[in-house]
Amino acid sequence: GPAGTNHEFVTGKYLKYRGIKNAQIQLIDDFLVGLAMINNGEADYMIQVAVHPECANVVATAHFEYGIHVIDTFISPSKELGIVTRRGIKTPKTLALQPATIKYIDVKKWEQVVYVNSIMHIPEGLLNGKYDSGLTTLEAAEKHKDQLRVDIKVGTVDDPWLVYGKCRVSSGNLVASSSGTTPQNLCSF
């Protein structure tokens, strides 16, 4: 997607966590294109949030069509999110959101829901009058605070993420974290 997405934000955090300093992040709008890029040697890895509506399709396509596998998983909070509305709109009627975020709020308050492929497209649509409100980053509202306001703070979401690559890490056995960060309530089993 465009610059500033949670995918870019979280990918940067993941690379730093793994100590990878020389990687270049290339943003794409279509995960199937990303798989083709890995297959053709144009990319080494791809990161996808596991709550993305196309995730199951991407995992299956990666495995069965390209021989690409999920090689790592992790959990990371998103950017701070909220319902951002154009100033001057008293009763918002339209709400833009990325389909994976639909359960973050009660959408019944709006007459129409408009789906977009990235929350980073929402501020532009708000500023252009395409919709009244949108579920996007709070930093977008801050950047355009003269034109946009925050109606609801959603906060961050701890999302699961998948890393795709060519080298399969599972040889038929369970692969799980042994980093010692397992939540305490899971340790009692």
PLM regions: where:
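Domain-level signature for soluble enzymes in the chorismate/prephenate branch of the shikimate pathway
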Residues: 1-189
